[in-house]
Amino acid sequence: MQENYKAKAYDILKNLNIEEGDLIEIKKGDLRIRGVLLPSYSKDERIFVIKLDNGYNIGISIDNISEIKLITKNSSKAQESERKEVSRNGAKSEIKIISTGGTIVSKVEYETGAVRPALTTEEIVQFLPEINEIAKVDAEVLFSILSENMKPEYWVKIAESVKKAFDEGNTGVVIAHGTDTMAYTASALAFSLRSLQGPVVLVGSQRSSDRPSSDSAINLLSAVTTAKYAPFGEVVVNMHADSSDTYALVHRGVKVRKMHSSRRDAFQSVNDKPLAKVLWKERKLVMLDKSYMSKKGETTLDAKFDNRAFLLYYYPGLDRDFLEHILTNTKIRGLIIAGTGLGHTSSDYVELFRKATKDGIFIGMTTQCLFGRVNMNVYTTGRQLLDAGVTPLEDMLPEVALVKLMWVLAHEQDLEKIRSLMISNLVGEINPRHTLDLFPRWSYE
């Protein structure tokens, strides 16, 4: 277990029979430092990495250390042995954990302070022995990228890995993913994987796993709980529900959005209720919405995407020539508009849209408001856009509509068939009924 340490640091640990995960005390001058020895990812071979009681990780140079004392051995050795056995044989696992990168599998680079996607899912499991109390897991690192670098071709690889995991006998899948584009991937998987045998749970964290305020551990424990106990066969996002560590929420993958840049409870269901909440301390899943897709017998895979689609966020003063260039001088096959209010753009673009739809380009309308649905029959401009061939997309989120369009374009060439699929509720991306409690209200009392 000292394999992450090299040269002199390795020799010191080996001679004292100290391994990663052991509680140790280091004396350096008048300073005594007690904490758990962590793996070192430092390029400096003379650094020990210690997790303190307050949750912070520190690097300590071996120079001028007068004493290193072993306090207690790692208590999770037996569980670790079981984890290794499970990892060697995926058929023994119940839940597959697929790592794609992101903050939940990131480490701080102590030379620079930067966060890098270097921690594998297996290493997270090593520091979360509680996972074995929930289910037997098997970990796989599919790739290690930051979520802003996600691409449609990666969605295909993730979908294929999920299908393989179910074919191997797993009853649920957890996908560790960066939070910034998690909703895009969740949508892509929802359209690509049908008749799911069990839940597919995307999970991430807003703060890396070596920070004292990290949400990594709770989110991952909650995700495995969801994958183990959920009665549904759907793609979902499992994240913190509040700014403390009370519980997590499970959101339908095509009705969720990251609504804050840094808060741990950044994810919120939009135009829909969360499917469930997870009481992570009790390892308990509480269903909040019974209108879910049940588990099926065999998962089907249909992961194809055509990225000749464009998401346009309309704004006053949008240059007409720029829009015309997109519609006439590129290879675009479809345009999703995030319009104002009930689904509008300036009437200046109506004839551009009319020509584009006549040329076979699909144009769909969503709302920048996010909450609520488009209704283009209310005002004159909306009716003009309808007449020009713009298709209203109900209460679909703009990003979901974009991913859906990419999936539809890969399956259909005919514009009317594309329209038909885009307005069809395939995986719960359209909620036909809105109630008052779907809109969040902020109280200032």
Curated annotation (Swiss-Prot):
Q: Does the keyword rRNA processing apply?
A: no
Highest rank taxon of the organism: Archaea
EC identifiers of the protein: 6.3.5.-
Q: Which PROSITE patterns match?
A: ASN_GLN_ASE_2, ASN_GLN_ASE_3
What SMART domains does the record tag this protein with? Answer: Asparaginase
Catalytic activity reads: L-glutamyl-tRNA(Gln) + L-glutamine + ATP + H2O = L-glutaminyl-tRNA(Gln) + L-glutamate + ADP + phosphate + H(+)
GO BP terms = amino acid metabolic process; regulation of translational fidelity; translation
**What residues sit in the active site?**
T103, T179, D180, K258
Per the database record, which ranges form the Asparaginase/glutaminase domain?
93-425
What sections of the protein cross the membrane? Answer: none
Q: Does the keyword ATP-binding apply?
A: yes
Q: Which GO terms describe its molecular function?
A: asparaginase activity; ATP binding; glutaminyl-tRNA synthase (glutamine-hydrolyzing) activity
Q: Which positions make up the signal peptide?
A: none
Q: Which family does it belong to?
A: Belongs to the asparaginase 1 family. GatD subfamily.
Function description: Allows the formation of correctly charged Gln-tRNA(Gln) through the transamidation of misacylated Glu-tRNA(Gln) in organisms which lack glutaminyl-tRNA synthetase. The reaction takes place in the presence of glutamine and ATP through an activated gamma-phospho-Glu-tRNA(Gln). The GatDE system is specific for glutamate and does not act on aspartate.
Q: What quaternary arrangement does the UniProt entry report?
A: Heterodimer of GatD and GatE.
What's the protein name?
Answer: Glutamyl-tRNA(Gln) amidotransferase subunit D
The species this protein belongs to is: Saccharolobus islandicus (strain M.16.27)
